[in-house]
Amino acid sequence: DDQIRANADSNWSLDKDASTFVTNQLLLKRDIDWNSTFFKTGVWGTDLTGVASGVGAGEFLQWNDSASDPIVQFASLQTDFVEQSGRKANTLVLGARTITALKNHPDIIDRIKYTQRGVVTTDLLASLFDVERILVSYATVGSGAEINDAADQDAGTTYSFMSDSKSALLCYTPSSPSLMTPAAGYTFTWNGYLAGNGYGIRMKRFRM
């Protein structure tokens, strides 16, 4: 509003900050939609569940257990993926606690201990799991009623990871997307039909 603009050190910076804030909120909404729609069971062809013990059909030993073998498991999943789809999985999406468990797994640490840095990174994990890239979901969201008091608002807000932090998604995403190229999913924008940038966002200024 006019008071905030009058108190700003630079009007140009204020416009930029406002645009960045609104854009981030829109992208956050897109992340929320993706997580609630796709980063869950019942959507993809194969669902596996990590268990603490007594592994049965469709289950595996949780990766925070030193007796588990995520490297062999991913190799098997990759083979199954190629057999069922004709394409090699190249993208692995991990929850925040999943990446922590994998980085501290003794088998993985043993495999990379003679590398240049001896530190488990997402690049090294990608090589071990034979994928091109690993994406980690660290986004968080706050939930709670809006309260017109900073202290009460903070006390009444609960923060959590947007994604299931103990989940993983192995999928195929092409480097050159198109309507005729299969992929785990697409988000298209209709260029020339609606104004906006590549994310389908456009900016408009108005007085408040």
Task: List PLM regions with ranges.
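Alpha-helical scaffold segments that mediate packing/assembly in large oligomeric complexes
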Residues: 2-88, 96-111
